[in-house]
Amino acid sequence: MAQTLINDTFLRALLREPTDYTPIWLMRQAGRYLPEYNATRARAGSFLGLAKHPDYATEVTLQPLERFPLDAAILFSDILTIPDAMGLGLDFAAGEGPKFAHPVRTEADVAKLAVPDIGATLGYVTDAVREIRRALTDGEGRQRVPLIGFSGSPWTLACYMVEGGGSDDFRTVKSMAYARPDLMHRILDVNAQAVAAYLNAQIEAGAQAVMIFDTWGGALADGAYQRFSLDYIRRVVAQLKREHDGARVPAIAFTKGGGLWLEDLAATGVDAVGLDWTVNLGRARERVAGRVALQGNLDPTILFAPPEAIRAEARAVLDSYGNHPGHVFNLGHGISQFTPPEHVAELVDEVHRHSRAIRSGTGS
């Protein structure tokens, strides 16, 4: 049975086509701020238990859509699935975040790196994509909203692979980049090939848009960012499938702290650039001059404010962009685990309400 999208507003906005309102989804929209997520995680036993079992991943992917009229679903997974598939031994210690048992530090470590067999090592992800697509679709073949697939960027993956986990200053990975750029470029080359293959596998399984999360690109200096992050994002984008089943598959790139390099990101070949909250959205729209759509960019901590303040800040973001195509509303980074769910409901409602008013010319 042929599938049709009931709500394709998100995809049309990414392609800079006119929409009746501004679509919204939220980074980490399926997460610890939702009681139902925590209940499912408890059943799964761990974060990796959630991410590596398609039934659980499907369940938590759909949870925010049951609460809020969001305009897209995003695959529940983790950005570190690729290095885990490379054999680095990913674990999430309680209260400590991700850790790798086998960090990549030496020439011998780098020499052992290889692009994983996506089907053999990451089949649980593509299985989840297929299962989520089925769950989003009713008996008549009508799909509620599009599904987003994603990966970490080559540089961001390298940060975790070399540091062995998170870091405050990234001194180990940066030291390698400056002292042994040959090793760093070898890691990044393998990562770029793996990210492209991984995203293409998600597209073939049913992801209708894909996003590259360059969470730590902003830790680099100007110049180093272009060499070690941007160039490899460009390589990934060049290898992506941009059509599947007769439909365009838009690509989004997001560098946290990357406002300085907006024009560079817009020139990578992506359809949209994600922005954090430090960037003026109206000026960003002028800077990209219609070449790409923009996604963002409310400060996530605003969701701790009273409802009327949340609504006012949402209106400010929408007013900054103005009545132009090509905007997807999002946070400037992932939603905090401490966010009250009822505040998310206020945000989603105001984005839909006020953007419709802007389109109609009333704007209030």
Curated annotation (Swiss-Prot):
| GO MF annotation terms | uroporphyrinogen decarboxylase activity
Pathways per UniProt: Porphyrin-containing compound metabolism; protoporphyrin-IX biosynthesis; coproporphyrinogen-III from 5-aminolevulinate: step 4/4
Q: Which GO terms describe its cellular component?
A: cytosol
**Which reaction is recorded as catalysed by this protein?**
uroporphyrinogen III + 4 H(+) = coproporphyrinogen III + 4 CO2
Q: Can you name this protein?
A: Uroporphyrinogen decarboxylase
NCBIfam families per UniProt? hemE
Function of the molecule: Catalyzes the decarboxylation of four acetate groups of uroporphyrinogen-III to yield coproporphyrinogen-III.
Return the annotated site residues (Transition state stabilizer): 78
Q: Which GO terms describe its biological process?
A: protoporphyrinogen IX biosynthetic process from glutamate
State the oligomer form and interacting partners: Homodimer.
